[in-house]
Swiss-Prot record:
The modification N6-(pyridoxal phosphate)lysine is found at residue 199. Catalyzes the reversible conversion of 3-phosphohydroxypyruvate to phosphoserine and of 3-hydroxy-2-oxo-4-phosphonooxybutanoate to phosphohydroxythreonine. Disulfide bonds: none annotated. It holds the Pfam family Aminotran_5. It catalyses: O-phospho-L-serine + 2-oxoglutarate = 3-phosphooxypyruvate + L-glutamate; 4-(phosphooxy)-L-threonine + 2-oxoglutarate = (R)-3-hydroxy-2-oxo-4-phosphooxybutanoate + L-glutamate. One of its GO terms (molecular function) is O-phospho-L-serine:2-oxoglutarate aminotransferase activity. This is Phosphoserine aminotransferase. Keywords: Amino-acid biosynthesis, Aminotransferase, Cytoplasm, Pyridoxal phosphate, Pyridoxine biosynthesis, Serine biosynthesis, Transferase. It comes from the Bacteria. Its cofactor is pyridoxal 5'-phosphate. It is an enzyme of class 2 (transferase).
């Protein structure tokens, strides 16, 4: 069977080495004679797995000692509500920067839980010469006392990524569901980072939360116990039965990432993948990117065909060529190639060759 390259935005492809190992030990994990899905989450063998997973993630991201690492339920949307309930209390306010679909969704959830009067927003995307770009205002000039500032540094639907640091007088909370572990970041600049696992970490059903000590003293609202960060810390992410198979696969992804050189090497690869794909889009009049170069996502490359009548044919022929899940999000249309950490350079090169051939045939 010829190679299939999966460009799905999430759940996304996992490293083949991780999938092969999971397949090999599916029925007999760690010499136990049973699957990892069948062992107690409180067994010494599984506890050892969780401890190694946290240690590897701390090493990969250089997470300081005053941060807790939590493995939780709920995905990104679950964290939309958890952030509000854990930190706003009865009288807190928060500021949300909006740069695309997911940050808008976070605002909607926050307003539903806390009320619109407690949530302020700033739209940081504008269109300049037909391209969407990000402009972050001087936040130090805002004379308000917010519990936190929330933003999404990579918008999967819109293909927009923010690479600059946020200079905020309030604790910064970042939804890094789609770009965590894709490039080096300074964790100490954030009060909290959360990420749904299903793009760069593992399968859906798990979310990673990295939270600074001082955030946990903020007043909270009544909420579900399984989304309470304080209870999660006190119980080592095991207040209730966690998604053990997803945790296991996340641990294997962290191990794999270390084996290929860590985040620094992955960042170099991701830069090269994005460079080759955007270069193809820019060099051919057949395709167009609607995002300014400085804000083009390295993870989610969105583009349009100048002749939209060819969209269906493009997708059909791509499927035949082994290039799957290239259809853009229904809200924006066009195409989207998600090239997360697990996507090899070969997959991007194969896509570029297909795009060049398709353009030559239909120009």
């Amino acid at each position: 069977m010829s190679a299939i390259f999966n460009f799905c935005a999430g759940p996304a492809m996992l490293p083949p080495a991780v999938m092969q190992k999971a397949q090999k030990e599916l029925l007999n994990w760690n010499g136990q004679g049973v699957s990892v899905m069948e062992v107690s989450h409180r067994s010494k063998e599984f506890i050892a797995l969780t401890e190694q997973a946290e240690a590897d993630l701390r090493q990969l991201m250089d997470i300081p000692f005053n941060y807790h690492v939590l493995f939780m339920h709920g995905g990104g949307r679950g964290q939309f509500s958890a952030v509000v309930n854990n930190f706003l209390g009865n009288d807190g306010k928060a500021l949300y920067l909006v740069d695309g679909s997911w940050s808008k969704a976070a605002v909607e959830e926050a307003e539903k839980l806390a009320g619109k009067d407690k949530i302020d927003t700033i739209d940081i995307v504008s269109t300049v010469q037909g391209k969407r770009e990000v402009s972050i205002p001087d936040l130090t000039q805002i004379d308000k006392d917010y519990r936190y500032l929330h933003y999404c540094p990579n918008e999967t639907v819109d293909g927009i990524e923010i690479f600059e640091s946020i200079n905020s007088p309030w604790p910064v909370i970042a939804d890094m569901s789609s770009n965590i572990l894709s490039r080096k970041i300074d964790v100490s600049q954030f009060g909290l980072i959360y990420a749904g696992a299903q793009k760069n970490i593992g399968p859906s059903g798990l979310s990673i939360v990295i939270v600074r000590d001082d955030m946990l003293v903020l007043p909270s609202l009544p909420q579900s116990s399984i989304m309470d960060y304080r209870l999660a810390v006190e119980n080592d992410s095991m207040y209730n039965t966690p998604p053990t198979f997803a945790w296991y696969l996340a641990a294997e992804v962290f191990s794999w990432l270390k084996s290929v050189g860590g985040v620094c090497e992955m960042e170099k690869l991701n830069l090269e993948k994005a460079k080759r794909l955007y270069q193809c889009i820019d060099e051919l009049d057949f395709y167009v990117s609607g995002v300014a170069k400085q804000n083009r996502s390295r993870m989610n490359v969105t583009f349009q065909l100048t002749n939209s009548e060819l969209n269906s044919q493009f997708l059909e022929e791509a499927q035949v060529a082994g290039l799957v899940a290239l259809k853009g999000h229904r809200s924006v249309g066009g195409m989207r190639a998600s090239i997360y950490n697990a996507m090899p350079l070969e997959g991007v090169d194969t896509l570029v060759e297909f795009m060049q051939a398709f353009a030559a045939k239909h120009s």
